[in-house]
Amino acid sequence: MSKIFINPSDIRSGLADLEMAEETVELVNRNMEDSQAHLQGVPIDVETLPEDIQRLHITDPQASLRQDMVDEQKHQEDEDFYLTGRENPLSPFQTHLDAIGLRIVRKMKTGEGFFKIWSQAVEDIVSYVALNFSIPVNKLFEDKSTQTVTEKSQQASASSAPNRHEKSSQNARVNSKDASGPAALDWTASNEADDESVEAEIAHQIAESFSKKYKFPSRSSGIFLWNFEQLKMNLDEIVREVKEIPGVIKMAKDGMKLPLRCMLGGVASTHSRRFQILVNPEKLGKVMQEDLDKYLTY
């Protein structure tokens, strides 16, 4: 009888192919679940929305009934208390937010990075609020004390001198505060302590899993492994970049477990050329969002 010899390396490669096939099947099933999310009552992904969102009209009988009641109440109110579109400061702000939302949808359809889009949107919103809703510093220290006029002129004249003295001392305190900066600077010590504790917590959790490899979706519909060591970055630089990911600072302040795979993917997608070549950006965005949602619900 002839004997058939099998090379052990062939067995190992076959087992590796089986493992890759199982992981690919899991990834395909997950993608199928994501594509059928609208059938399960899960919110639809932003990428599936049409470009012209204004054409969408979702009808709800109860909502229309409530709207009719609200309209009737508005007609019954006095017209003097009604704010037109020009007088209401929230109307242009809502228009600005709608424009930012449309811009985000267009950029995500072009395949641009999520965190880059989000950071630009946050900067636009913050700059708009700072320009249109800013409160002068002098109003924070405005003297709201009232002075009642007494019937006796002698008491009024006698109290005028100390009132002037108190007013001058109060103005001196206001000037000293204005010279030293806004009132928020009094909180710098506590803010610095909070920032140091947050950075320490983030650095601690990253250092514990610095060499641990995490799975990421590849462009070839498979997966590949990556860890923090392959970033070739200092721990301080990684922590600085990770703090830009939404929700990480809040979780670190609360002492929660951080989404390390999401953090690694966010930093690597902007600082590692090899990672950018290997990873599938669309699937990476979904994986990172799933990790954030999962850890924030704990």
Curated annotation (Swiss-Prot):
Motif Nuclear localization signal, chain ranges: 212-215
GO biological process: symbiont-mediated suppression of host innate immune response; symbiont-mediated suppression of host JAK-STAT cascade via inhibition of STAT1 activity; symbiont-mediated suppression of host JAK-STAT cascade via inhibition of STAT2 activity; symbiont-mediated suppression of host type I interferon-mediated signaling pathway; viral transcription
GO molecular function: RNA-directed RNA polymerase activity
PTM sites of type Phosphoserine: S64, S211, S272
Keyword annotations: Chaperone, Host cytoplasm, Host nucleus, Host-virus interaction, Inhibition of host innate immune response by virus, Inhibition of host interferon signaling pathway by virus, Inhibition of host STAT1 by virus, Inhibition of host STAT2 by virus, Interferon antiviral system evasion, Phosphoprotein, Viral immunoevasion, Viral RNA replication, Virion
Motif (Nuclear export signal): 49-58
One Pfam family, short name: PP_M1
Region (Disordered) residue spans: 148-184
One GO CC annotation: host cell cytoplasm
Record PTM text: Phosphorylated by host PKC and by an unknown kinase.
Chain intervals with Polar residues compositional bias: 148-162, 169-178
Highest rank taxon of the organism: Viruses
Subunit structure: Homotrimer when phosphorylated. This trimer is stabilized by binding to the L protein. Binds soluble protein N, and ribonucleocapsid. Interacts with host STAT1, STAT2, DYNLL1, DYNLL2 and PML. Isoform P3 binds host PML.
Function: Non catalytic polymerase cofactor and regulatory protein that plays a role in viral transcription and replication. Stabilizes the RNA polymerase L to the N-RNA template and binds the soluble protein N, preventing it from encapsidating non-genomic RNA. Also inhibits host IFN-alpha and IFN-beta signaling by binding and retaining phosphorylated STAT1 in the cytoplasm or by inhibiting the DNA binding of STAT1 in the nucleus.
Family stated for the protein in its record: Belongs to the lyssavirus protein P family.
Protein name: Phosphoprotein
